[in-house]
Amino acid sequence: MTQYTPMIQQYLKVKADYQDAFLFFRLGDFYEMFFEDAVKAAHELEITLTSRDGGSSERIPMCGVPYHAAKNYIEQLVEKGYKVAVCEQVEDPKTAKGVVRREVVQLITPGTMMEGRTIDEKENNFLAALTHFEDGSYALACNDLTTGQNTVTLLTGSVEDILLEVYATGSKEIVVDSSFSKDELNKLTETLKMTISYEDATAIPEGLEHLVKNVSQAKLIKAVGRLFNYVIRTQKRSLDHLQPVEIYYTNQFMKIDVHSKRNLELTETLRTKEKTGSLLWLLDKTKTAMGGRMLKQWMERPLIQKERIEERLEMVETFVNDYFLREDLKEKLKEVYDLERLAGKVAFGNVNARDLLQLRRSLLQVPAILEAISLLDNAYAARLIQGADPCESLTELLGRSIQENPPLSIKDGDIIKDGYNDKLDQYRYVSKNGKTWIAELEKRERDITGIKSLKIGYNRIFGYYIEVTKANLGALPEGRYERKQTLANAERFITDELKEKETLILEAEEKIVQLEYDLFTALREEVKVFIPKLQHLAKVISELDVLQSFATVSEEEQFVKPVLTTKREIFIKDGRHPVVEKVLNGKLYVPNDCIMPENMDVFLITGPNMSGKSTYMRQLALVTVMSQIGCFVPATEAVLPVFDQIFTRIGAADDLISGQSTFMVEMLEAKNAIANASERSLILFDEIGRGTSTYDGMALAQAIIEHIHDQIGAKTLFSTHYHELTVLEDSLDQLKNVHVSAIEENGKVVFLHKIQDGAADKSYGIHVAQLAELPDSLITRAKEVLAQLEGQEEIIIPKRVEVKAQAQEVIPEPVVVKEEPVEIEETKAETEEESQLSFFGGEQSSKKQDKPVLDAKETAVLTQIKKIDLLDMTPLEAMNELYRLQKKLKKG
């Protein structure tokens, strides 16, 4: 390294500690990058790659960005999952001896970003830390640096289960120890697309012990310690806004695994991965950013304590019934900014004057909000606002200190109000009156000299000056002015009087800017004292915001308050899928009941594709989730139990972790439900067994249904195309057949989207293909093949005619295949030969046989065959019927 210049040596020394990050190295007005950083950054940021002499024989790759535009470039890199170490000059270059001293002042990572376009105002930006213990358990700690929120939980289960819980936090970055399994790290980076960081220190850092007072378990403390040590090491600044660690256990909330959350589209849609079209999109009528974040957290973790759910429902009911209270609250909430993130900026030291004005405007709304809620006759409301401090002294302080329209930068002055500081007022008086004096001097000099174009100006190099054009130089009184600068068409002069005033004015202006900066930083420290109170207020206001949001959407969409029962019964009258109904935007939506008394556990749902089976199943799950987060539900009446878990297998399998096949994922999800569901769970299985052969699939589906029915007793909706399974209603007393109705009109299927008792009488597969606009020729051929499979009495099958190039088109002549009288074949081989030929559309055997005389049993079978409506049966149903008739004949 000795061959490099001192500056490059300094760069390499700093870079050695930040090998996994881009090093933004401050050089004057630029942040420069060198060596591999420069090559990679130039590519990622699409900026010019240059080179410079660094003392070695070869030039060093280099690229840079202006310091005033660095924020945008840093955000671009962090968005892509990179880390950026910001290295600043920490001494004045004018007074430095040798190379200017530089230090990394912050490491910016995906999990520690404080602001920017990557930070959604209504979403948390969690940094996760995962700690593995010898007994196979894990502790997961999370921190949102923008709000100061900290959580920790203990996890058990497979590695995939643990990683899915990590995925559920939405974290973009995870901190682990340096010995963490490489295989597990690969799953985090390749599948979950998370940035990996390392931290081996696990002791709680000095000064943060108060944040873990309520945490006694050593494993949890170790995970939190790893998280806090990483945050301190990377941020290198005050963390006064960090909140006490909240412990949560997964069994305290309704458990919904990641696959189920995605299938149900709770917070984002399956197709676009966006909020629009999800349940969160529908329910989010929050007026504050922090309310939006709390709503999402509630949706991620629905409650299972009946009393807590009912408390929320009662508050929502209060807001629904009191329009004026709700509207007044909404108007005030509109004026409340993000108190949590403002508190974080105060602690971090990057809050500006405009931020503090937002804080003041927010606090002005608080007294009226708290007073309105205090008047409610509601124990939950009283408990919610208990201890909430409106911080009126802070409001008053900000009101008399900050100008109404301050600049964005805190170093440009014009931030502090007149009257806040005596010394500042004095400097401003000198500056203001000095400029007035300058204007008066200009007028006086014009009168004395008679030169109307004479003017007094200012620039940073020469200060104040009197400027006279060369044409008027002869009119100047002798000895009155001292020449200062000669221009092409003018001369500039000064006087002793002007010099004196210049000194006073410039000193005052410099002191104003510096004093305002000092006063603002002191004010910022005063605001820090209020951070805990502001965070408590933020939680109160967030909760009120979510509750009014529930009330608003419940009234707008005509939702009803659910009644929670300790019984295992579901009674939903005219239930609707809330999102589908909203998307239909006024078009007719068909509501459906879901009535499952205590002695009814399984609905076996049949019906054609596109008829609404999956929508009906999702509808029940969404109604359940809405109920247990404390929202009204889309129905005219709803009585619901409190479910402990929801398991789903709906839609296309999407394996997040292990890369398994669709059928394997389907079976793993079925296993998850069977292994973990209780009689208090809700299971939704859509077309289980479709990923394998017909008989395997049907056998598995039946076995799963029987196990759920006999061993678990969970409320279950099980949709299937295996119509043969509907006979289970005869042997399973807590299973009921229901179907989605459809009718045929003019050869076309019309879906009624109505759930009715009993099994479906037809699958309408080819009709659905018609709706999908498959080619007419394909549809016609499908009907022909179906007719062959079902043994139709008379089938018209077009001959396949090969048409050679440029040959005349030949229209195939239809061949009529007539059904021979039913006869019992003497040998199995002959029977199979006939069957195979018929299946592939070949000609019947030419072997002539005498027409036998049928006995009474055979005649009865023939009569039954003629009465069968084959177009109303699935291929499997037709085959089963054929076996039954064959057995009947053989018995004879």
Swiss-Prot record:
Q: Which SMART domains match?
A: MUTSac (SM00534), MUTSd (SM00533)
A Gene Ontology annotation in the biological process aspect, one of them, is: mismatch repair
Q: Which Pfam families match?
A: MutS_I (PF01624), MutS_II (PF05188), MutS_III (PF05192), MutS_IV (PF05190), MutS_V (PF00488)
Q: Which is an annotated GO molecular function term of this record?
A: damaged DNA binding
Q: Which UniProt keywords apply?
A: ATP-binding, DNA damage, DNA repair, DNA-binding, Nucleotide-binding
Specify the domain of life of the species encoding this protein: Bacteria
**Record-level GO cellular component terms:** cytosol
The record's region (Disordered) falls at 826-854
Role: This protein is involved in the repair of mismatches in DNA. It is possible that it carries out the mismatch recognition step. This protein has a weak ATPase activity.
Report the family membership.
Belongs to the DNA mismatch repair MutS family.
Return the protein name.
DNA mismatch repair protein MutS
Which organism encodes this protein? Bacillus cereus (strain AH187)
Gene encoding it?
Answer: mutS
